[in-house]
């Protein structure tokens, strides 16, 4: 992965969380945030000038906050709506990331977001993968970008 891709992932992810979910990243990722396990995730595959997938993983407190902020809801939100809200965030984030990677040049096709099984989460990085962790008052999120080699 090129350094320019690495540079673009964090600011693009942070801006998407801010603009779509109204969650504002912490200045520094704390030890407490890093210790929080991921309890939910979505994966969005894409193809076009570059192909791969983007994963968004989140700790327990993040998804209710995303859902409440995106839907303007107060209090407990249906688990299916939480899954849908995280999927929509993953979809928008994927679109923003692929556009930033290619400076808006080219057409990309995104597959629908798919829920991920937390039992399958790994902290190990794969070849051609970039990963950023983002801390929030509500917990932390992780964005992982996998590019296919072709």
What are these regions (language model features)?
Residues 1-150:
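N-terminal auxiliary interaction/assembly segments of multi-subunit proteins
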């Amino acid at each position: 992965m090129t350094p320019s891709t690495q540079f673009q992932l964090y600011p693009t992810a942070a801006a998407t969380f801010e603009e779509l979910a109204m969650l504002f990243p912490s200045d520094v990722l704390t030890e407490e945030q890093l210790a929080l396990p991921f309890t939910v995730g979505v994966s969005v595959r894409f193809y076009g000038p570059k192909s791969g997938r983007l994963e968004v993983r989140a700790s327990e407190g993040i998804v209710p906050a995303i859902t409440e902020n995106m839907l303007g809801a107060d209090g407990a939100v249906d688990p299916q709506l939480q899954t849908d809200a995280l999927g929509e965030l993953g979809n928008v984030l994927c679109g923003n990331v692929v556009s930033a990677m290619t400076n808006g040049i080219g057409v990309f096709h995104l597959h629908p977001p798919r829920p991920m099984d937390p039992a399958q989460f790994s902290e190990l990085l794969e070849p051609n993968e970039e990963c950023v962790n983002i801390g929030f008052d509500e917990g932390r999120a992780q964005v992982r970008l996998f590019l296919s080699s072709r």
